[in-house]
Amino acid sequence: MELETQAAFDPASFEHIPVLLNECLEGLSIDPAGTYLDGTAGGAGHSRQIALRLDAEKGGRLISLDQDPDAVQTARARLAGLPATVVQINVRYAGQALESLGIDKVNGALLDLGVSSHQLDDAARGFSYRADAPLDMRMSQQGETAADLVNTESREELARILRDYGEEPFAWQIAGRIVEARENSPIETTLQLADIVASAMPPAERRKNKNPSRRTFQALRIAVNHELDALEEGLDTIFDHLAPGGRLCVITFHSLEDRLVKNKFRRWSTACTCPPEFPVCVCGGKAKAKLITRKPIEANSQELEENRRSRSAHLRVLEKC
């Protein structure tokens, strides 16, 4: 079988249907004269719709960020002629990007944390377990690959990654099988890894689980791209640069992301920080924000029918005080 290899990139090929688009636009409560940040441009679906609602003559402006060079190229093409600036940078450095453009505060910000359809569908990027390709998984296309990780880390560290980032119940068994396999030859492709993962699963689990590699691939992708660390730092720096009354909208796609965002939002929207055993508040704290959504917004039946990748999307919205 031939491996998928990466060809010259065409922005027109970057297909990504923006998830919960109308809900995000409503959540941002866009001021045509405001400054907005999209920290995860992807296919620029959300970015374009935000930019279309801004009035450049009144100072309206969008800053759109992404670490993926393909996404940046796509965003620049699709935002051409609109009041938008596209910067190639990881969201954890959003504050630096804003400051470099002379921007202190934004009136709203959006993060869509899903892997784009383009990244999943382009087998050569190594995110998918359905086609054979180099085991890559790098969003930025720089640094350590998933192949580097599975061929060098100890069984203990691999098991930790699979357990912590993939919530994989068979983490120890899969890690052991990876170590055994690489002693014979390096693990270099996605289907090699998928076969190894399947072989580590009990037969009953293989029969029950149509995609036994899903959790392992998620865990490795998160580890390779340091996604949770980047998300935590990105949330903090974006909140620091959010103007009073500004909205922060975050779309998550798995429980690890959602838990992190939920806890951040709860902390910012809680006034008292005293230990729970204190009978009365003594800290005199004030909430830094208020929750616009008490529970996450999910895709409606029409969107679920039109875009199956929206089924795990959860949108949370916060307003800074």
Question: Where do the language-model regions lie?
Answer:
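S-adenosyl-L-methionine-dependent methyltransferase catalytic core, i.e., the SAM/SAH-binding region
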Residues: 1-321
